[in-house]
Amino acid sequence: MPAAQPSGFVATLLSSPQAGEEAWWQQVARLGTPLVEAQDSGRVRMTFLWRDPDGDERYSAIRRVYADINGVTDHHSTDPQSLERLPGTDVWHWSMAIEHDWRGSYSLIPIVAAQLPPVFSDDGQLRDEQQREWWCSLFPCAIADPLNRDQSWGEQLSAAHMPAAPSQQAWRAVDNGTALPPDAARLTVLDWKSEQLDNQRRIWLYTTGISDEPAQRPLCIVLDGQKWAEETPLFAALEAETAAGHLPPAVWLFIDAIDGETRCRELPCDAAFWLAVQDELLPQAARLAPFSDDPDRTVVSGQSYGGLAALYAGLHWPQRFGRVLTQSGSFWWPNLQFITDFDQRDTLEPGVLVTEVRQGGQTAWPLVIFQEAGRREADIAFVNQQMHEALVAAGHQVHQRVYAGGHDTLCWRGGLIDGFRWLLTGDDPQAASRD
């Protein structure tokens, strides 16, 4: 994480007569961006800088450098946030105040005059459609921040970690480019051909650590498995935490979502999917890597629709799935008004799973749940609070965490490790880091 510079550091940097010169840029590169300055009241000031490869405004065709920051900038705006050019230089810059524990992913989007916003319609619906079409047309221009010292991830994404952001020590090797690929001897990629679901998908089966009793190893189910096996591979972080003694030897089952249509059908409260997992997939996986059938040694994890699905599985089959890791769960489902009409949230009909928990009374099968959502995903944070209150009232054990960030894989990856650790060992790594 970056060390905070004293207040006024960036103003001095930008007012320097050497601003834009090679030595000036070398200093910025050594510091890494975004630059962070200390402020009062639990906030810092972060500054993004970009070097125009074509020089100053006399030679460069660049007219905007949009900052697309998860949960911070408004990508629905007809006038999105742009960095500003320091006149007469190749320096583009923009600063803003943010929570000192914020974390988020971001891209920079340099564009030329032909890509500037069009003249938008006065009709609201048409204007929204025009804005979306225009904004999506800029996606090919998005770049990772070349001055960010961490390795870019997610293709065009960079990571920003403020000084007090929760530790993600398990991911340091990934961030600095030294992470090893998964141990081929521990990884099995198989096809699950489901008769009950009438479809086929990839499954990644991974084992960590050494156990004297393989059949007693915990089972950890990871929904949206393609994300955590390929796009943001979890393996190196799991190996690091297991080697450090923070996680026990375990069996990890990554379930591919197949595609968007299938995901939207199977993850929101679909009994058929979970029956097929229990009847078909778990026996197939256990033949390859034995694991416990104890619900207290079985964790189901997911984000967004996956967070909804993980809790649904636990609530409906607590005798098999006793531990749940839900991140940014879509507990609004199926009431889209929480997204489209959030200002009316207090009058809206709750999501079906919230209602089910509220009306179910005291549970006979208390679950152990790690639940988190981001302060900068307002609708998701609201429905997660609804669900948290319902779960506690029903007698479930819930460890709730609200982080400074958005609907962001960069935040979820840390919560995954922390959640698995708490659910499998009882340790809260963030509490330990504060002691």
From Swiss-Prot:
Gene3D superfamilies: alpha/beta hydrolase, Immunoglobulins. It catalyses: Fe(III)-enterobactin + 3 H2O + H(+) = Fe(III)-[N-(2,3-dihydroxybenzoyl)-L-serine] + 2 N-(2,3-dihydroxybenzoyl)-L-serine; Fe(III)-enterobactin + H2O = Fe(III)-[N-(2,3-dihydroxybenzoyl)-L-serine]3 + H(+); Fe(III)-[N-(2,3-dihydroxybenzoyl)-L-serine]3 + H2O + H(+) = Fe(III)-[N-(2,3-dihydroxybenzoyl)-L-serine]2 + N-(2,3-dihydroxybenzoyl)-L-serine; Fe(III)-[N-(2,3-dihydroxybenzoyl)-L-serine]2 + H2O + H(+) = Fe(III)-[N-(2,3-dihydroxybenzoyl)-L-serine] + N-(2,3-dihydroxybenzoyl)-L-serine. Its main location: cytoplasm. Keywords: Cytoplasm, Hydrolase. It is found in: Cytoplasm. One of its GO terms (cellular component) is cytoplasm. Pfam families: Enterochelin_N, Esterase. Its EC number is 3.1.1.108. InterPro entries: AB_hydrolase_fold, Enterochelin_esterase_N, Esterase-like, Ig-like_fold, Ig_E-set, Mycobacterial_A85_antigen. GO terms for molecular function: enterochelin esterase activity; iron ion binding; peptidase activity. The keyword Cytoplasm applies. One of its GO terms (biological process) is chrysobactin catabolic process. NCBIfam families: PRK10439.1. Catalyzes the hydrolysis of ferric enterobactin (Fe-Ent). Is responsible for the release of iron from ferric enterobactin. Belongs to the Fes family. This is Iron(III) enterobactin esterase. It comes from Dickeya dadantii (strain 3937) (Erwinia chrysanthemi (strain 3937)).
